Amino acid sequence: NKFSIHHDDQHILINGNATKDINDEITVELKDVNVSYILGLVNFHSVEFAGYATGIARGRSLFGTPEADAKIKVKNFTFEGGRLGTLDVKADWNINDGAINIDGLALDEGKRITDIKGYVSPKNSDIDLHIKAKNTRLEFLNTFCDSFLNDIDVYGTGEVNVVGPLKAIQLIGKAKVEGTAGVTSLNTYYTLRGDSVYLTPDDIVFKNDSIYDRDGHLGIVNGHLRHKNLSNFSYDFN
């Protein structure tokens, strides 16, 4: 049995048999399909991912004890509007634990690497991803912090866990950050040169970090970039 959806050069091709038999398989072939569309189909709206997915997904025993796996490449992959490069990801799902296990690697220009491993569980409505970042763009902060920061052009290296209920996601870890960002209220740009920031529940903490203005003058910043489950960001710096 075959079914297909086409739009210009994009398509979804579905082929196979959906039965209780573990030997019967449904194959879904994707070509340049918008990730936002796919996530909408499974009602995932906790955070925004985008890009164009090409690859194969397979499902077995869909009316018995279903299993599924996929191998996908996502071009122009973004998280909350922030660029992360091209993502290669393997995923598998088993109904017994209800989790989608993820093993992904995003490669961006400038030898930026983001390694992603863990799971998302639609059944339990939770997430646990371990992310190793090497000079990863943090452009997504432009979405979260647009009320008080602008033109955020920073990069992070470190390890961060994305954990918690899907409606209350938290970031936990530590990263070295470098790059520039503008403070809207001061109409001034500042530069970080590899100091550490600490990610704790509902808080991103700066401890004695060095910052530089456009003339190279040094300042020391301590403070907090607070949020509520990755929303309603605010800051308290001195």
Language-model segments: which ranges?
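Interface amphipathic segments
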Residues: 1-161, 166-238
